Amino acid sequence: MLNSLQSGSRLRVDFSKIPQELDVPNLLQLQKSSYENFLMADSKSRENSGIEKVFRSVFPIHDPHNRISLEYAGSEIIKPKYTVRECMERGITYSVSLKMNIRLILWERDEKSGEKTGVKDVKEQSIYVRDIPYMTDRTSFIINGVERVVVNQLHRSPGVIFKEEEASTSSGTMIHTAQIIPDRGAWLYFEYDPKDILYVRINKRRKIPSTILFRALGYSKLDILKLFYPITKIIIKENKFFIEFRPEDFIGRVEFDVRDENGNLIVEAGKRLTKKKAQKLIEEGVKYIEFPLDVLMDRHLASPIIDQESGEVLYDTLTQLDEHKLKKILELGIDEFEIVNDIASGKDRAIINSFIADQESLKLLKQTEGIEDENDLAAIRIYKVMRPGEPVTKETAKAFIQQLFFDPERYDITRVGRMKMNHKLGLDVPEYVTVLTSEDIIKTVQYLIKVKNGQGHIDDRDHLGNRRIRAIGELLANELHSGLVKMQKAIRDKMSTISGSLDELMPHDLINSKMITNTILEFFATGQLSQFMDQTNPLSEITHKRRLSALGEGGLVKERAGFEVRDVHPTHYGRICPIETPEGQNIGLINTLSTYAKVNELGFIEAAYKVVKDGKITDEIVYLTAAQEEGKIIAPANTEIIDGNEIKGDYVEARKDGEIILVEKNKVELIDLTPRMVVGVAASLIPFLEHDDANRALMGSNMQRQAVPLLRTEAPIVGTGMEKVVARDAWESIRARRSGVVEKIDSENIYILGEDENGAYIDHYRLQKNLRTNQNTCFTQKPIVKKGQFVEAGQVITDGPNMDHAELALGKNMLVAFMPWNGYNFEDAIVVSERILRDDEFTSVHIYEKEIEARELKHGVEEITRDIPNVKEEEIEHLDESGIVKIGTYVKPGMILVGKVSPKGEVRPSPEERLLRAIFGEKAGHVVNKSLYCPQSMEGVVVDVKIFTKKGYDKDPRAIKAYEEEKERLSKEHHDKLLMIDREEMLKIISLLSKEPLEKDAKIKDKEFKAGEKISKEELSQINRFALNALVKSYAPEVQKKYNAIKTHFQNEKRKLTEEHEEKLAILEKEDILPSGVVKLVKVFIATKRKLKVGDKMAGRHGNKGIVSVIVPEIDMPYTKDGRIVDIVLNPLGVPSRMNIGQILEVHLGLIGKKLGEQIQEIFEAKRADFVKELRQKMIEIADVAKLMNAKETIEKMSDEELIEYARDWSKGVKFATPVFEGVTAEEFEKLYELAKMDLDGKTELYDGRTGEKFKERVTVGYMYMLKLHHLVDEKVHARSTGPYSLVTQQPVGGKALFGGQRFGEMEVWALEAHGAAHTLKEMLTIKSDDVEGRVAAYKAITKGEPIPQPGIPETLFVLTKELQSLGIDVEILDEVKDDEETGTN
């Protein structure tokens, strides 16, 4: 059982009601395993990797003239040259190089026939394909220095799907359709039309009768009829028509009166023919029954009727019978004929109607093409629909159809599609056949006819059995395949054009890998599924990597996606989170995997269940897909259980195919693993989620992803137990690779010394400090282990941003009161105490990057220098001798960060100037100041500077100094590792020798030892290693052997460390890669502190968001009886209508945690003699409220030091975990209230801070976990005086990024009109907008202190006239109105 008090490196009281038997699987497993299966970079045998399969699907490539072939012989992957960090700093892609080995075969061939006769020559060559972006250990990609994530795509699974949808032509009419969806290739649609004709469409082209497709596949008319209809033999006796009596033809009610050969009525029309009665009739000898004439009239012939005498075909197959034709048949004296029985159960006239519909078009084609064979004509008809206007022969048409569905290069339904088709249509085609077969097409249509006639099952396209996940590996394989197909075409073209001798030809002459390069680069750089990684905090990063998008190539388009696709489906249970999805137009199209969900190798999502047998829960855990779950009866996780594993009661509420039913407990087959399996990671971090409305929970889970990392982190008092899981799987924390003891530790390094079966080893972990993330938040790691502490493998040893003791910590625990406060918390606004600012509670650090390039220009090279023309000395005193700002400088807007001068264009100097230059030398006047200045909205401390210099150019002193410092750091690191490994070696050797007796006499310094004596550790430690080498010879051979083994192991370890060090130095020595034309690149990183301000957005975890409206002095805030001042005042009206009651319960539990923490603090402060015993008792008493935990046992086993450490943490507030759907119950609340000595209503008397008067009503006060979101007012507020204007309209541009103006819209105009502010309005619409001349005149008038002149004509008017003129309408603007007389009007 995994439920324990331990959470990260602290204790947390867990209120789970169900024992947790399975740990949450690694949250990033899907991405990791998918990419690993694609590349298999670390495997020795890579034959099964996705990349190998792609290459094999395209090769071999043959020359159309049978002269040469290209074969694929394997691929090779070369590891990355740079580390992840360096790629980010240098702005390059973190990638592996891919090489493929290609074999070129030259063939001997017969000159006459052109056939191959034997191999002439074979050449093999390794060809570099391209660099493929390589997944970092944090499951992201570095593309051009930017960290990106490839989101998993949720798309329609290949296979066959049957639907019922509304006809586009006539409203209300439902039509039935079948679709065969491939992964690659032409889509095939079969659809009924309102006239009951079955049509087929290929790739949404014009529809054609389905029988044309069957004929093109080679079926004759009779074959098709036999495939779709029972053929009934009509026997003629005494001018009456009879059929053989078969009871199975009369399922359900009988359509017509059934009479025997003598005309006796057996079954009346509309009655049922039971099995019993049918059997009785057979026993009575009824063999034939009369076929009514009126029913026979509308039937069609299944075989032609031939005149026996002349041999002439009177009536062809499918001729519709009528009175005249039947008379003729009787006259001819024919005994029997066959009809198509289209009135049999489950049949309709669709195929017959299709035959009738296709007759006209085939007749026309017969005349135009001059071909008699209808099958060839059908193929030509399809070709003409697919490629209209192109010339066609019957061979081309047949080959085209063959390519369309039966060619593996053009068509692929994948293993998944084949499996689904076999399952749906009852086929047993082998899984490796991933093209269509004729049988697939026939069976699809047969099933569609059944569906139309109420016998088949309509599919639900939103069922997760019909949707699958394409993860990074598959998406990349598809891109690679499309690139290779383009390359294959180019190679074939090249092969066919090669002439002359082929002896000198090499594989690289044929292969152009640029096509592959372009497709892969496009996918990563601009693809819809390759996204800029959300790095605001660890949670946002993890959920971004677990995201499932229905958009992207081959997916849905958000503008066209309907409501059904977006809705929550019963099969989402345990697979896709029903809560976490964006608000807005992407709602429901972008989802997240549930906590325990896994994705199987076919891409279907699996949910975890425990098996139930005979009403007893077993320990067996199974993962099922939505399709496997069909028909299963599943009990919920919170079903009551007795005796540890038996379901209580005789009946239980359970789910079956999305319906809730009441069943006997013995019929239950499965039970949910845990209630948490329903929701995703972000939603499972919301305590008391079960008490929140889904809309607000959605906002809550989305807003947690926007929480900014704070300066000081603090884990929530009220958590859910998922905090440790997120911290465990986020790359921001460092986990120990192997177990061992912390040997050395500082703020930047952790060294762990351990031992395994191979001997001792040392693991070094480098901590990251002050790094900028994608969202400009600050990323810093800090150690949470101590020197000498033993660390398990996989244990978290450092906290990242938003982490506290290996738990996720997104915000702060704040004392909150729900009450109005002078109208300042109207409409969700938040009133905040000044204490929060003073104590830096919600202060965050943001790092911004500014960069500048020095380029090679036509007339010289730009230079980064301190020597800038026309700049005062005091403006550059913070720059070093290279002209770059010093680290630690506090910069303000307008300050120079990097000095840069650019040469002016060549100006011919005057003779005087030339003379002066000759005397005084070149002067600095021919350069322009192009320095990098600190932008307007930025202020902060320079935390880092990176300088990159192109090969062949001198490095400046600053770059040389940075290089020397890094080299020194690497050397110190290497030296420390060697020292530790040396010390461990000596300890091992001394330990070995001190236990063994001497075999010969030995002497250490002046002391002699006789054979058989043992030398103590103290004496051995006095000797140096050279003396030890001599001393070992006095020991037995076995001891010497062990000694040599130890020496060898440690020498190998040291060699490994040295190789590692040399590798790092080699990378450091590498030249910088810069874009062409760039000589030097300088990046400056500025850290800005952002305190909480009025206008910042804050939120709780329950979707309760608001804007800080006022920051109140601490003394004015409400306070409790015991003098506790409230931190935040929230509006109580934000709770009832939003229905997120979880926040109230959180506040109560938070206050309980704090009060219990104070009780522990009192024990510390009292310092009684047996205070440890008292602490232990208190902690057991608190933890015992949660039933499931073995708290007493755990706490009693703890050492005093451990206990005091955990109690110190609890003294700031006892930490609780209330998991979703199994949180704290009312009874547990009562016990906790009692322990915390609180009132049962959870309310408190509050006093007004300004007057000291008590508020009339008692107020809900408690601790809520509040987050500061990344919508910061500092980054949003912006003002413009004058600035850029739009080119066409001449109106100011919009937005902060462009330094734009505020839009004065329609409603603002109404506001000015309402106030009668005519002049202000005129000003707004002219000189402040697009009156070009007017604004220039106004500017002049203001500078000269003159009155502002009348506005001119707005540019909009000129734009309008130009647009009208472009339509051919002559428009003139008249400067003044002429007199009426002159214009000729009265």
Curated annotation (Swiss-Prot):
CDD domains: RNA_pol_B_RPB2
Keyword Iron-sulfur among record annotations: no
Signal peptide: none
GO biological processes: DNA-templated transcription
Catalyzed chemical reaction(s): RNA(n) + a ribonucleoside 5'-triphosphate = RNA(n+1) + diphosphate
EC number: 2.7.7.6
Keyword Transcription found: yes
Gene Ontology MF terms: DNA binding; DNA-directed RNA polymerase activity; ribonucleoside binding
Keywords: DNA-directed RNA polymerase, Nucleotidyltransferase, Transcription, Transferase
CC annotations in GO: DNA-directed RNA polymerase complex
Function: DNA-dependent RNA polymerase catalyzes the transcription of DNA into RNA using the four ribonucleoside triphosphates as substrates.
Similarity-based family: Belongs to the RNA polymerase beta chain family.
Quaternary structure and partners: The RNAP catalytic core consists of 2 alpha, 1 beta, 1 beta' and 1 omega subunit. When a sigma factor is associated with the core the holoenzyme is formed, which can initiate transcription.
Listed name of the protein: DNA-directed RNA polymerase subunit beta
Lineage of source species: Bacteria, Pseudomonadati, Campylobacterota, Epsilonproteobacteria, Nautiliales
